[in-house]
Amino acid sequence: MVDVNELMQYERQLQEQGYKYICGVDEVGRGPLAGPVTCTAVIMPLDDLIQGVNDSKKVSKNKRIKLYDIIVEKAIAVNTVSYDNKKIDEMNILEATKACMRDAIMGLSVEPDIVLVDALKLDIPYKTMGIIKGDALSYSIASASIVAKVTRDRFMEEMAEKYPEYGFANNAGYGTAQ
């Protein structure tokens, strides 16, 4: 398991520069054939770190669910937005992802001083820092990735019950050999 302090490099540098409310934003659902793109923006307290936080793809499902509850409870502010297939088809997946991220950020109950984003450029009224592979390098982005992943997975589990013939319980909307 990665020590959560290893994910604090960017946040610590920004704190030293005087930034207080550091927002991480991430998305899930850009690659699947079905289901929404889901984006979460989160501002975490940086003096009370949650051990186990990491890129959602590197955390087991059970651990993600536990971390989700802790992140949502401890967050200074958190907001999740999902865009459905109609919105994605209307805009294209890249533009839908950017708009979804923007809406997640703009819906926060606390204004961020700076937004850390996983490599995309966003049109928002806040200073941004793009970090390639940010969900694996930034505590704030990793926290957002966990909340977004659990939220989307829960939605896809509901869809699996409603439409069992599509196998969403096993594939979460991603293409498989099945």
Language-model region placement:
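RNase H-like, Mg2+-dependent phosphodiesterase core
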Residues: 1-178
